[in-house]
């Protein structure tokens, strides 16, 4: 008999935290679950401790795989292995709140069959556990009880602009929905949530916010997500994310029934973020030209078609900026002029009183070595 929940846990070098993470599941009063732990090649006793706990509870299932530097492999393999009706993603240094599985089960039972059940997370910094912050994308006073994926996409843009939290851990997924759409994370990508979540949200037929603070998210300096903030990984990851999301828009925008407001929404989010990351004056000064060109060549390795298509839904200023982006990438002689244009572009935007683009939720998305300069 298949369990109600499949909890997929990414585990790599988390010896100090792994027992607490697993016990936050095993001590739940609701017991109809399986916990699938993906063990990346670790330098500490993570695997040893997990094998000890799995021997004591047959609901804990283990698999190992080579070190990849991200949670993508565990999440993909774990989804393939999962037998439960609903999937929860948990990191090996985080926990879930007491009695939360029972509460979520009852809420799902009251509104069964949705593809996504967004919840809340409780974020805290290691060493300052008494200072906690609840984060939610769908405030009860601003969100209907149920939405389509398109409605949810547009609502997040209206409520948060680009500042909604894309973390997979915030959402309970119907497993058959993930399988039906072959929703997978890009292998090795450290910011896979930012690429995966917009696609999953758009494809969902039913989204039911639960307003349940069930996930305890630990912010620590040596985590994978913190390592992803270094500029070397940072721009490469965002190049891959943008390339994928631009291509996804190009695909779904050709389908019958596509709501053109989604193009407007994604253009406001995606084009603004792209211009800021590669061409905001502070980033131009802080990130070497070679690194920006290297990652732009990754982003546009298949050409500019998908970018141009999304750009059509952007405002006139962003469309003009897109012309200079293409010139910057294609023609070395124009790079200095293009950078001067972007100094003027962002300067005028700020003079008009527009908010400087921000993509932070739990922490800044700008890498530390950029912010410090």
Task: Describe every region a protein language model picked out.
Residues 87:
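Short aromatic/hydrophobic "clamp" motif used to bind/position activated sugar donors
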Residues 92-209, 215-233:
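Donor-binding/catalytic cores of nucleotide-activated saccharide
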Residues 31, 39-49, 67-68, 96-97:
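A conserved acidic beta->alpha catalytic loop
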Residues 213-221, 227-256, 273-306:
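Catalytic core of nucleotide-sugar-dependent glycosyltransferases
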Residues 13-27:
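Short, well-formed alpha-helical segments that are part of the catalytic scaffolds
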Residues 65-82:
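Glycine-rich, basic loop-to-helix element that forms the pyrophosphate-binding segment
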Residues 2-8, 26-37, 45, 57-61:
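Short loop->beta transition adjacent to catalytic acidic/histidine clusters or analogous donor-positioning motifs
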Residues 281-373:
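Membrane-interface aromatic/basic loop that binds lipid-linked glycans or pyrophosphate carriers
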């Amino acid at each position: 008999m298949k369990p109600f929940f499949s909890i997929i846990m990414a585990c790599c070098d988390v010896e100090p935290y792994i027992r607490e993470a697993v016990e936050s599941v095993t001590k739940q009063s609701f017991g109809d679950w399986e916990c699938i732990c993906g063990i990346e090649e670790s330098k500490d006793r993570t695997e040893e401790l997990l094998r000890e706990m799995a021997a004591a509870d047959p609901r804990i299932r283990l698999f190992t795989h080579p070190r990849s530097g991200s949670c993508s492999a565990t999440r993909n393999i774990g989804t393939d292995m999962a037998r439960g009706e609903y999937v929860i993603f948990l990191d090996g240094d985080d926990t879930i709140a007491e009695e939360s599985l029972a509460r979520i089960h009852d809420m799902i039972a009251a509104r069964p069959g949705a593809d996504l059940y967004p919840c809340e997370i409780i974020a805290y910094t290691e060493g300052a556990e008494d200072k906690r912050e609840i984060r939610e994308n769908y405030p009860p006073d601003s969100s209907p009880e149920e939405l389509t994926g398109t409605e949810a996409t547009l609502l997040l843009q209206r409520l948060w602009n680009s500042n909604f939290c894309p973390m997979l851990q915030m959402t309970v997924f119907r497993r058959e929905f993930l399988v039906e759409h072959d929703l997978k994370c890009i292998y090795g990508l450290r910011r896979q949530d930012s690429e995966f979540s917009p696609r999953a949200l758009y494809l969902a037929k039913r989204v039911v916010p639960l307003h349940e603070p069930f996930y305890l998210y630990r912010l620590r300096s040596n985590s994978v997500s913190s390592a992803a903030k270094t500029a070397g990984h940072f721009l490469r990851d965002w190049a891959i994310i943008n390339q994928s999301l631009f291509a996804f828009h190009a695909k779904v925008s050709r389908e019958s029934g596509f709501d053109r407001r989604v193009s407007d929404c994604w253009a406001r989010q995606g084009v603004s973020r792209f211009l800021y990351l590669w061409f905001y004056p502070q980033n131009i000064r802080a990130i070497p030209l070679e690194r920006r060109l290297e990652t732009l060549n990754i982003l546009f390795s298949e050409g500019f078609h998908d970018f141009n298509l999304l750009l059509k839904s952007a405002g006139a200023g962003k469309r003009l900026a897109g012309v200079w982006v293409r010139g910057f990438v294609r023609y070395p002689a124009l790079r200095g002029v293009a950078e001067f244009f972007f100094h003027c572009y962002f300067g005028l935007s700020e003079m008009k009183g527009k908010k400087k683009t921000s993509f932070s939720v739990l922490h800044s998305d700008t890498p530390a070595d950029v912010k410090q300069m």
